[in-house]
Amino acid sequence: IARHMPFRIAAKNRYENDARARKVWDLCVRTLRYGAQEQIQDCMEREKGYYLGDGCYSMLAWCLLNGDFAPMRKFIDDFLRTSFINGGLVTCANCSFMQEIAEYPLMMFVLLPVLEERGDSREFVRERLGDFRKILDFYRENYAGDDGLLSNLDKWCVVEWPSQWRDGYDV
């Protein structure tokens, strides 16, 4: 027996007639259908909270597939609520695990235009713009270099490319 949030496919699979592409589509749909239980988690066996960075893309795909954007609004609010711990937000919400990854809160901005396009979410976005400005202010005040890039990070930074791919970027 499997339990999951209500999930109806609203998106069209344009590769319906391609057997290989259909397998990938089906895998992705099943992963999102059964992996989202009120929130997005990387690994159901070991993680007790959910990650902001991975959750942004999983939540976006989940909402676009089924047309229900209520979980995305909950996702955003859950992470905005962590600002009392750190103005740049924490990486993992709804749990006691304290972790900060610089890029993750900034990735959440990708969700705003998607919600803004939906007539029923415009007010939600407008009401939270001040909170999003505070995130930008936090990173500008604490980590912005003269070139506009994040620098002097004292937290984990996902963007730690191998030296041969850095193009002179100092991690």
Feature locations, PLM:
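Aromatic- and histidine-enriched alpha-helix N-cap/loop-to-helix transition segments
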Residues: 49-56, 67, 99-107, 127, ...
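Extended ligand-binding clefts on enzyme/binding-domain cores
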Residues: 45-66, 140-151
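The feature captures the catalytic groove of carbohydrate-active enzymes
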Residues: 86-108, 122, 140-171
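Glycine-rich, acidic and aromatic/proline-enriched surface loops and short helix-turn segments
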Residues: 30, 34, 64-85, 138-141, ...
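Acidic/polar, glycine-enriched structural segments that form the non-catalytic walls/loops
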Residues: 1-52, 122-124, 129, 133-139
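Extended, hydrophobic alpha-helical segments in both membrane/secreted and soluble proteins
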Residues: 104-115, 128, 132-136
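Active-site-adjacent bridging/hinge elements
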Residues: 2-4, 27-35, 78-88, 151-165
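Alpha-helical support elements that line or immediately flank enzyme active sites
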Residues: 52-82, 112-120
